[in-house]
């Protein structure tokens, strides 16, 4: 079967979502050799992945992930692909806590660093959080704190079969696109950053195929987030329709800032940065970068009439300093809840 698939891809033939889903279920089960995986990834990349192919791969991963009980209330995710190579501070993690403080719970799917010196998982771990509490503990955090972190390796163990190939290839493939698309909580609202501006609209259409109700996919001047230093190319998904947009910092009422103002450091420094920022002590460029991205999430979720209003709400939440308390509560719950779950399992 695989040779026929590779021949078709090399001839420029697109796969259906169902075909791609079946292939990725084989990947997850460890049924494909490293040579077959290499050929599949490279052939898809050379042809150019379609929204249907990406959606099929994402469905396979969602369908085989560790289950997470979806809440009935509205919640969201803000996650980027990484891979932009810019080594900026970990904006998306701060965005999640700010959005939660503004009333929008966030189930953040994430991993360790891809393009920066510190990913979401690295920063939270440096703050003392447990990355791998049981799913029910994470759901409790979402309910009680308005934030939970779903660590990708914990929920998608089958992806380990692709790691040797990804390390050997050292090029971007469909695997680099999938992280933000396979949140096991299947959030109805999402802001997704992407490393390639040419994939912005593709990704928005893919989210629609996956059942996302409202989304914004962004690439800002080389960053997988809304930028302060350049216009941001965006695609908004609403009611099944994708609309292309261009976002300028002035649209949100914040000042431009050079990308150099957002350069990051290692986990310990990022943890301190995150704590200070959420306590209302962030540098202006850091504050505005987080606010415009949190504002986009609040806008897309319907908590604000537009980006400017959403950004103002985010700035208010940042200024209050209360998001830092939310961070402290999450760290404690992730650690203590995991310990309680282990004790119950031991005595149960």
Curated annotation (Swiss-Prot):
- Describe the function of this protein: Catalyzes the transfer of the phosphoribosyl group of 5-phosphorylribose-1-pyrophosphate (PRPP) to anthranilate to yield N-(5'-phosphoribosyl)-anthranilate (PRA).
Q: In which pathway does it act?
A: Amino-acid biosynthesis; L-tryptophan biosynthesis; L-tryptophan from chorismate: step 2/5
Q: How does it assemble?
A: Homodimer.
* Superkingdom, natural source: Bacteria
Protein name, per record: Anthranilate phosphoribosyltransferase
The entry marks the following residues as binding 5-phospho-alpha-D-ribose 1-diphosphate, namely 80, 83-84, 88, 90-93, 108-116, 120
Give the family, as the similarity comment puts it.
Answer: Belongs to the anthranilate phosphoribosyltransferase family.
Q: What is its EC number?
A: 2.4.2.18
- Name the encoding gene, please: trpD
Binding residue positions for Mg(2+) 1: 92, 225
Record flagged with keyword Translocase: no
Cited SUPFAM superfamilies: Nucleoside phosphorylase/phosphoribosyltransferase catalytic domain, Nucleoside phosphorylase/phosphoribosyltransferase N-terminal domain
């Amino acid at each position: 079967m695989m040779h026929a698939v590779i021949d078709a891809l090399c001839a420029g033939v697109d796969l259906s979502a169902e075909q791609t889903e079946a292939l990725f279920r084989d990947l997850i089960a460890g049924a494909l050799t490293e040579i077959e995986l290499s050929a599949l990834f490279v052939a898809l990349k050379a042809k150019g992945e379609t929204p249907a192919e990406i959606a099929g791969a994402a469905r396979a991963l969602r369908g085989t992930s560790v289950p997470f009980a979806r809440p009935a209330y509205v919640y969201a995710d803000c996650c980027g692909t990484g891979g932009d190579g810019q080594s900026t501070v970990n904006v998306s993690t701060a965005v999640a806590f700010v959005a939660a403080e503004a009333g929008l719970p966030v189930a953040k799917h994430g991993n360790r660093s891809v393009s920066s010196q510190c990913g979401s998982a690295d920063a939270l771990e440096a703050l003392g959080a447990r990355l791998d509490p049981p799913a029910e503990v994470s759901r409790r955090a979402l309910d009680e704190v308005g934030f939970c972190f779903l660590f990708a390796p914990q929920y998608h163990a089958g992806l380990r079969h692709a790691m040797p190939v990804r390390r050997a290839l050292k090029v971007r493939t469909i695997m680099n696109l999938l992280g933000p698309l396979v949140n096991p909580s299947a959030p109805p609202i999402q802001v997704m950053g992407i490393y390639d501006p040419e994939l912005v609209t593709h990704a928005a259409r893919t989210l629609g195929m996956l059942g996302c109700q409202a989304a914004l996919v962004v690439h800002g001047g080389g960053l997988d987030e809304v930028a302060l230093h350049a216009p941001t190319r965006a695609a908004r998904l609403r009611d099944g329709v994708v609309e292309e947009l261009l976002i300028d910092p002035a649209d949100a009422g914040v000042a431009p800032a050079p990308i150099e103002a957002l350069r990051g450091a290692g986990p310990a420094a990022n943890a301190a940065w995150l704590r200070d920022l959420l306590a209302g002590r962030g540098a202006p460029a850091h504050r505005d970068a987080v606010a415009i991205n949190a504002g986009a999430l609040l806008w897309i979720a319907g908590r604000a009439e537009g980006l400017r209003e959403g950004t103002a709400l985010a700035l208010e939440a940042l200024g209050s300093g209360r998001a830092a308390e939310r961070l402290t509560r999450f760290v404690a719950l992730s650690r203590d809840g995991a310990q309680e779950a282990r004790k119950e399992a031991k005595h149960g």
